[in-house]
């Protein structure tokens, strides 16, 4: 969800009857625009409003995708394995996206900068990862999500390193959101 003035934007997917899910952005209580053509399944997982430009992160045809307003901006993966963009943020003039692709039977978290893979979010072999939120402050990139091993463990990454483990690992936990207020560089 994004808010601008008195307008509320929401995004997700819409499926009617036997059609494939469409990636849709709503403005207030009406469909604002559709981002996909219905030929392949698509959906939006996150929005970022920068000035008057609305960015949407999601998937189309099994590939991670980012849209700028109504137009496809980046296809982040080649579609050879299922992938989704799960988070998007803009810092200055740079767009960052987090998401995942499947590697065999495991999800592997990734952060992209301007449509190019910047780094992956791994905890080593046998442990997948799933980012749900990304925030950037100057040169610091933070991602919140989950690593998979014997349990699901909520973590926050700083760059490609785990900064905080948010649970003790005895049960399942997932971090879905975060917010970076400010950083002081000394």
Regions found by a protein language model. Give the residues of each.
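Short loop/turn motifs that cap or connect beta-strands within the blades
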Residues: 31-41, 73-81, 118-127, 163-172
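Repeated scaffold domains used in trafficking and secretory/extracellular systems
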Residues: 1, 41-48, 82-89, 128-136, ...
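Conserved small/polar residues in nucleotide/adenosyl-binding loops
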Residues: 184-186
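Tandem-repeat architecture and repeat-register "anchor" residues
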Residues: 1-4, 11, 34-35, 50, ...
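Beta-propeller blade signature
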Residues: 24-27, 66, 110-113, 155-157
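Structural motif
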Residues: 18-22, 62-63, 105-108, 150-155
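Recurrent small/Gly-Pro-centered beta-turn motifs in extracellular repeat architectures
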Residues: 11-14, 56-60, 98-101, 143-147
């Amino acid at each position: 969800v994004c808010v601008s003035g008195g307008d509320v934007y929401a995004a997700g997917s819409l499926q009617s009857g036997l059609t494939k899910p469409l990636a849709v952005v709503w403005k207030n209580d009406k469909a604002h625009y559709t981002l996909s053509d219905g030929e392949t399944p698509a959906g939006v997982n996150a929005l970022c409003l920068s000035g008057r430009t609305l960015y949407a992160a999601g998937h189309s045809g099994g590939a991670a995708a980012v849209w700028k307003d109504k137009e496809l901006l980046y296809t982040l993966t080649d579609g050879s394995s299922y992938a989704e963009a799960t988070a998007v943020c803009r810092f200055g003039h740079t767009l960052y996206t987090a998401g995942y692709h499947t590697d065999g039977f495991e999800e592997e978290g990734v952060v992209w900068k301007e449509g190019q893979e910047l780094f992956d979010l791994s905890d080593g072999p046998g442990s997948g990862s799933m980012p749900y939120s990304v925030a950037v402050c100057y040169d610091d990139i933070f991602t919140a999500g989950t690593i998979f091993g014997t349990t699901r463990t909520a973590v926050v990454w700083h760059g490609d390193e785990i900064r905080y483990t948010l649970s003790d690992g005895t049960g399942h936990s997932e971090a879905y959101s975060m917010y970076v207020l400010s950083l002081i560089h000394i």
